[in-house]
């Protein structure tokens, strides 16, 4: 066990949020850190992750070498004139009735381009990002094969972590970065709390990759090589270039009130996928036909927690505010969390300060991150013609400024306020 008279921190979970936090603490503080990861090595599932301008700025603030390495491997729109565009939004299917079609609800109709501010947006392969993070961390920082079972908060004597393999570890505090199925969250909130476990959002998706040359042949260069969003009744599709422009990534979403399965991901057949999009326009149908075998990914989020901490236990990233992907900002919020918490912890001089530091972090992040969960669910309804209906003028108006509050955030102002409050509370 680690001696209790030394200030040291455990991070549970070696995903994007956990490793960004570990790098922050390595760069900003002298606090020893141990990362406990359930898997035999660092790694991430899922094809890609989106970072908006706010997240790109946070990555640069955490580590310029990380930003340079990730930036070299990031994917963006391939047309130079589209570098400032987040997504081009289009109608993906014909209107449900003659009135809708007369108003322009026709497959292929261009709605608008949503532009983003500098430093732009990145699409990054999750495993590439984790690889780059791991390279910048001391190799002896991680403990693998550690599945957390319990945390005992002993107050001034620290916390004791118990793992499935029977081992224990004592630290000054623990930060749970263990994702949407977070064991740390259930310990903090209690297993019976409705907010302790993931909630199905009424949406699911198929994911796949299409060779870029085939996509260009069917869609043309502009639509294949740049980020596109196709909207429709109870569904939408996103496409964007990955693998240095050699492939087009596809995420195809559908609405469904029920998810009767125990698992979040289940196998799907090509026939199921084609049936789900049978009444869509030619572009979307052609894309689905090009996709290979795909699983079905149910989309869950977390109901609001009253706080992201309890005593010497803190939550970060998806463990505190997992959201749907409809605004492309969930992973970015985890990076923001890591930067904010790292900056607050640089002012901690003794273990007794940690609960107050966690409280300051929770207050700084709660409103913004919960707003993401709520507005991301709303965005799913908007894209699926379930919020403004198929009124494309209202949808365009909603899109115009929808992302500004996410992208234009000055985190340093929140950090300054949090540190001031933390100092007063000590």
Write out the residue ranges for each language-model feature.
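Active-site-adjacent segment of FAD-dependent monooxygenases/related oxidoreductases
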Residues: 45-136, 383
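Conserved mid-domain beta->alpha element of the FAD-binding
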Residues: 11-28, 36, 175-176, 206, ...
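Glycine-rich FAD pyrophosphate-binding loop
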Residues: 26-47
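Conserved FAD-binding catalytic core of PHBH/FMO-like flavoproteins
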Residues: 67-70, 95-97, 118-292, 305
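Residues at the starts of beta-strands that form the adenosine-phosphate
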Residues: 8, 32, 247
């Amino acid at each position: 066990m680690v001696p209790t008279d030394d200030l040291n921190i455990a991070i549970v979970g070696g995903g994007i949020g956990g490793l960004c936090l570990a790098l922050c603490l390595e760069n900003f503080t002298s606090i020893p850190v141990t990362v406990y990861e359930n898997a035999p090595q660092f790694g991430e599932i899922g094809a890609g992750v989106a970072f908006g301008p706010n997240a790109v700025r946070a990555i640069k603030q955490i580590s310029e070498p990380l930003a340079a390495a990730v930036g070299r491997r990031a994917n963006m729109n391939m047309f130079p004139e589209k570098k400032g565009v987040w997504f081009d939004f289009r109608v993906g299917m014909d209107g449900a009735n003659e009135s809708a079609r007369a108003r322009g609800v026709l497959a292929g109709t261009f709605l608008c381009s949503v532009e983003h501010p500098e430093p732009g947006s990145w699409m990054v392969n999750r495993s590439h990002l984790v690889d780059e993070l791991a390279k910048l961390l001391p190799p002896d920082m991680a403990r693998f094969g550690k599945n957390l079972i319990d945390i005992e908060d002993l107050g001034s004597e620290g916390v004791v972590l118990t793992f499935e393999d029977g081992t224990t570890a004592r630290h000054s505090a623990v930060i749970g970065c263990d994702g949407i199925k977070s064991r740390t969250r259930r310990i903090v909130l209690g297993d019976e709390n409705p907010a302790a476990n993931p909630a199905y959002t009424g949406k699911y998706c198929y994911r796949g990759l299409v060779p870029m040359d085939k996509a260009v042949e069917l869609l043309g260069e502009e639509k294949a090589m740049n980020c596109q969003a196709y909207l429709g009744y109870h569904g939408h599709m996103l496409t964007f270039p990955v693998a240095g422009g050699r492939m087009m990534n596809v995420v195809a979403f559908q609405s469904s009130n029920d998810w009767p399965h125990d698992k979040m991901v289940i196998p799907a057949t090509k026939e199921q996928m084609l049936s789900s999009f049978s009444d869509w326009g030619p572009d979307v149908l052609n894309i689905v036909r090009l996709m290979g075998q795909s699983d079905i990914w149910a989309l869950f989020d977390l109901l609001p927690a009253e706080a992201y901490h309890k005593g010497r236990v803190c939550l970060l990233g998806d463990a505190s505010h997992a959201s749907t992907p409809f605004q492309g900002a969930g992973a970015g919020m985890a990076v923001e969390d890591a930067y904010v918490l790292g900056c607050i912890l640089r002012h901690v001089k003794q273990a007794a300060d940690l609960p107050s530091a966690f409280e300051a972090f929770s207050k700084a992040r709660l409103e913004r991150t919960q707003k993401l969960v709520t507005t991301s669910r709303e965005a799913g309804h908007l894209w699926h013609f379930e919020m403004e209906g198929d009124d494309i003028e209202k949808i365009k108006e909603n899109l115009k400024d929808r992302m500004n509050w996410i992208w234009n955030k000055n985190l340093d102002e929140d950090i300054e306020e949090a540190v001031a409050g933390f100092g007063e509370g000590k």
